Amino acid sequence: MKFVLLFGVLLVTLFSYSSAEMLDDFDQADEDELLSLIEKEEARKDRIPKHHECTSNKHGCCRGHLFKYKCQCTTVVTQSGEETERCFCGTPPHHKAAELVVGFGKKIFG
């Protein structure tokens, strides 16, 4: 009887230890996933949407449907005669053509 009781206590102790280890692993995985999501959200907030100014951050444009938007710049002459560069995030013409072809392909085959 003592042997069965000792074996039972040992079994319960091992079971509680292993379940505690598994819970710690799950908690760590949840924390890692949460940190990853927070980092992605921060990176997304730093991105510049389409048609917004990107003069100070030319590589920070968002992604479009298929391609990343490109920072397109033009030179503007102000009323005082100064030339300044103004940039905006947009879709280049060759990307627009590719998106149009893909859109037609989806309508025909999709």
UniProtKB/Swiss-Prot annotation:
Q: What is this protein called?
A: U1-lycotoxin-Ls1gg
Q: In which tissues is it expressed?
A: Expressed by the venom gland.
Name the family.
Answer: Belongs to the neurotoxin 19 (CSTX) family. 03 subfamily.
One Gene Ontology MF term: toxin activity
Q: Does the keyword Signal apply?
A: yes
Q: Does the keyword Transcription apply?
A: no
Q: Which cysteines are joined by disulfide bonds?
A: C54-C71, C61-C89, C73-C87
Q: Which UniProt keywords apply?
A: Disulfide bond, Secreted, Signal, Toxin
Propeptide residue range(s): 21-44
Give its localization.
Answer: Secreted
Signal peptide annotation = 1-20
Q: Which lineage do the record's taxonomy fields give for this organism?
A: Eukaryota, Metazoa, Ecdysozoa, Arthropoda, Chelicerata
